[in-house]
Amino acid sequence: MNVPCRAGGAGSGIGGLVLAAGGSTRFGAQKQLAELDGVPLLEHSLRTMRTAPIGRVVVVLGSGAEEIASKVDLHGADPVVCARWEEGQSASLACGLAELADCEAVVVTLGDQPRVSPDAIRRVIAGRNGAAAIRATYNGNPGHPVLLEHDLFEALRDVTGDMGARNLLLSVQVLDIPCDDLGGGEDVDTRDELDALRARGPVTGAAPVE
């Protein structure tokens, strides 16, 4: 699909990429559709991306793609089905970057991190200083969002497995941006983890996008 990064008239050459292609093996069902505050987990991630200064947004789907696309409000994001999703997160990342190849940079988030703050996205964008990648950290631990500059795209399209992209980042200049005060770095991999997020109260920060 040849769609400009600034699609929709957005003023940013930065694209948004939400990875949501996993099979939810540990969860036991399509966790992208599990509800938090009455909204599917994936929709929280998409709403958050839409509140940031970003142009085109792509969401990568794989397992259960048709059902997910029919039940989740994508908030203007373009769905891309990655045929290689079973090869791991790196394959999904490669599929998404191929769709956003004309962007000067791409901000990556995950579809199972509903509490990632829009301010975390703004913070990593504001931190651009020539580093190949900029990522949020929580209590010193690397997390998302991660901003990838265009110079990394080609190399990232060649990595494999769930750890491939992380290993590549070990070899380039990465700027870590502390986001401890914003919270939201938790993945939802199990039903117990979802219950724990529910117990913390409503998700805040990402206003609904009309």
Residue ranges and their predicted role:
Residues 1-12, 154, 158-210:
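Conserved alpha/beta core of the MobA/IspD/sugar-nucleotide pyrophosphorylase nucleotidyltransferase superfamily
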